[in-house]
Amino acid sequence: MVRNVVVIGTQWGDEGKGKIVDWLTDRAAGVIRFQGGHNAGHTLVVNGEKTVLHLIPSGILRKDVICYIGNGVVLSPGALLDEMSMLEQAGVDVSGRLRISEACPLILPYHIAVDGARELAKGPEKIGTTGRGIGPAYEDKIARRAIRLQDLFYPERFASKLKEVLDYHNFLLKNYYHTATVDYDQILDECLKKAERIQPMVADVPKLLFEANKAGNNLLFEGAQGALLDIDHGTYPFVTSSNCIAGAASVGSGVGPQLLGYVLGITKAYTTRVGSGPFPTELADTTGEYLAQRGNEFGSTTGRPRRCGWFDAVATRRSIQINGVSGLCITKLDVLDGLEKLKICTGYKSKQSDRLYDALPFGADDLADIEPVYEELPGWQACTAGIKDFDQLPKTAQNYLKRIEEVCQTPISMISTGPDRIETIVFHHPFG
């Protein structure tokens, strides 16, 4: 029986999706990226070898898996070719196994220029973007002025569209942000040179995915960022520029929603966030530092330190609801080793009144008024790193995980106890 799986992050990204996607690909024929761009940072460790992918699907390290980049992804030609070169130098066949939708909007140098100028102008109020042009590229898409991948293979069409959209962005850069403009000829020459390498990988992705599913092949949809960064459902305006929830897998790949099956929600055993925005359970103390150091909490895309805090069951429940999560995968359990006490946020209360919340408020303004209500549990001193059998975990670790299941009202399907694909405990395989 064919079973397609959608993998999404239930927090603010950085939950460990890359490792889990890589692990799941032993039963998948295809892996699909359906949103975001090269602002994603998916870290994979195979036999001790670390690989960080930003754009190419994590299934690329399995030699028999076909990888797809769907229309929902904003594509940087330069980032794509750089990542391909990195993988090919390591002996990975990329061009023969990568299919890219011709409908992908392109990220070009003027998007990066606008992104940087905007963040600089906002000063302390900045969103904390990766600075890679993701937001401005999505803006062009919605405004119907985007240059898409298919345009790149028609030089006259591309040149005409580039001039029109660059005039718009250069006017903005010069007259609103009072910063340097971007050179037309340089972009034109660079893009046309890159087109030749990219063109053989361009394909009708919706058609290929439909045919793969019809042939009985399992498909794995790889989400980027996390549900709490979703443009509609996240902590707006401190969000990313795309829909990060499971439903976006359909829109961003061209696969009908009836073909999506199991939704696996990746969730850290604690909580982290990169950049600005509300974070109810954040720990600005030695415990937060402990989590950051043990968890090596630095962004794989930007290198920025991640903010760390206790597990937030209220926020996770919101993600479970909006994604239709079938089961959870708890990652980085081993980071909690050595802590005497642990806390789980089971509710919020208003700072101004006695009002209690059992659901995540929408938007950053409402979140600024709340503080967490905690339930305390005993920690454990034993090492859980690399354990592959639930019964071998300390009893207090087992109880912690069971309590997460109870307060999130969702079963745990998998537990990750280390970065390598083999360091995994499995209760229920998402592919059945």
Swiss-Prot record:
Binding residue positions for substrate: 300-306
Reaction catalysis annotation: IMP + L-aspartate + GTP = N(6)-(1,2-dicarboxyethyl)-AMP + GDP + phosphate + 2 H(+)
Binding positions (GTP): 13-19, 41-43, 306, 332-334, 416-418
Main subcellular location of this protein, as a coarse class: cytoplasm
GO-annotated molecular function: adenylosuccinate synthase activity; GTP binding; magnesium ion binding
Source species, domain of life: Bacteria
Biological processes annotated in GO: 'de novo' AMP biosynthetic process; IMP metabolic process
UniProt GO cellular component terms: cytoplasm
Binding positions for Mg(2+) per the UniProt entry: 14, 41
Positions with a binding annotation for IMP: 14-17, 39-42, 130, 144, 225, 240, 304
Keywords: Cytoplasm, GTP-binding, Ligase, Magnesium, Metal-binding, Nucleotide-binding, Purine biosynthesis
Pathway: Purine metabolism; AMP biosynthesis via de novo pathway; AMP from IMP: step 1/2
Coiled-coil regions listed: none
Enzyme Commission designation: 6.3.4.4
Cofactor remark from the record: Binds 1 Mg(2+) ion per subunit.
Active site: 14, 42
Function of the molecule: Plays an important role in the de novo pathway of purine nucleotide biosynthesis. Catalyzes the first committed step in the biosynthesis of AMP from IMP.
Subunit structure: Homodimer.
Record-stated family: Belongs to the adenylosuccinate synthetase family.
HAMAP family from the UniProt entry: Adenylosucc_synth
Protein name (database record): Adenylosuccinate synthetase
